[in-house]
Amino acid sequence: TDDDMGNSEVGHNALGCDQIYSQGAKLVGESIESGALYESKTWKSLISNCKENEKALHFLGLLSDGNVHSNISHLIAMLQKARAEDVKRVYCHILLDGRDVPATSALEYVDQLETVLAELSDSAHEYKIASGGGRMVITMDRYEANWPMVEKGWRTHVQGEGRQFASAKEAIETYRAENPGMIDQDLLPFVVAHDGKPVAKIANGDSVILFNFRGDRAQEISLAFDRKEFTHFDRPGYTGVHFAGMLEYDGDLKIPEHYLVEPPVIKNTLTEVLCKAGVHEYAISETQKYGHVTYFWNGNRSGKVDENLEVYEEIPSDVIPFE
C-alpha cells in the first residue's frame, strides 16, 4: 500500500496466487485492533503461565517500523496489554534493523521503546530491554544459510553471554564509536547488565513471543526454542519454554507449534493449477532467494505439490555480509 513498504516475499506470494489476501503487518494489525490476538488460546496460555508460575514474559524480534518483518507498534501494543493483565516481569530482546529503515536509525526505536517500558514499570513491575544485536549478525538467518548466526543469538538471549552494557543505547553508541561506518544491521551482540549480571536471560519455563510476522528469518530461531530434537547447535541446560510466534511461519512443517494470529489460507496457487493440468515446473535460485520461488510462490507452503511434475534447484549462496 502507500503506507507500507512492499517486499519480494509479498510480491512472490502475489505472483504465485494472483489473489488478494491480508497478510503480514495488515493481518496482525487487524488482529490487535479487534482484540482477537488477546482472545487467542495461545496468548491466554502465555500470560497465565507468567502469572500462575511466576515466570517472565520475553519479546524477541526486529525493532523497527519497517513493516517487512515486524512493526514496533505491535510490540508496544502487546507490552501494554501484558501490563494491563498484571504480568510482573517482561523483557525485550531486540534485533536492530537498518535495512528496511534508515541504516543508522536504531536509537530512534530504542528511545521509543525505553519510554514505553519506563511508563509500564513500577516497584512491582519490571519492563526492560535485556539483550540485542544487529539483524545480520545474530538470530535472523534464513534458509539455513548460517546456523552459527542463530547460535550467536541463542547465546545472547538465552544464556546471557556477550559484552555487557548498562543499556541498549550505551551498546549502540559504543559499537558505533569503535566501528566507524558500521550500520545497525551489523552491530555486535550485547547484553544489558547491572552489577555484572544480565538483566534477564530467557529461562526454562518462561513465556517467549517472537513478534516478527514474516516467516523466512523467524523459522530457525523458532525451531531452536520449539523442538526437543534439535541438532544444529548445543543448548546447554535447556529444557523448554512456552514459545509462540506472531504467525505460523510454515504450515507444512508446523513452525512454530503455537502462534498468536491465524495466517491466511492461500489456495489455488499457480503451481497447483499447473500441476492439475499436468504441466512440468522448474524452480531455480541461489539460496537467499530460493524460498521466494518455492515457499512464498506456493502460498507459504514448504515442499512440492507434485513430486513428479516439479523440480527445485538451489545454488548455494556465499556467506558474506549484506551491505
What kind of region is each of these model predictions?
Residues 1-137, 148, 152, 230, ...:
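Active-site nucleophile/metal-coordination loop of metallo-enzymes that catalyze phosphate/sulfate
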Residues 15, 190, 305:
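Short clusters of hydrophobic/aromatic residues that line enzyme substrate/ligand-binding pockets
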Residues 15, 210-211:
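Short hydrophobic-aromatic micro-motifs
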Residues 24-25, 139-140, 200, 218-222, ...:
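Short helix/loop capping segments that flank catalytic or ligand/cofactor-binding pockets
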Residues 59, 200-204, 217, 283-323:
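Anion-binding catalytic surfaces of enzymes that hydrolyze or transfer phosphate/sulfate esters
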Residues 67, 216-217:
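Short acidic, Gly/Ser-rich segments with clustered Asp/Glu that frequently serve as metal-coordination loops
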Residues 101, 105-197, 201-203, 209, ...:
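Long, well-ordered, tryptophan-enriched scaffold segments
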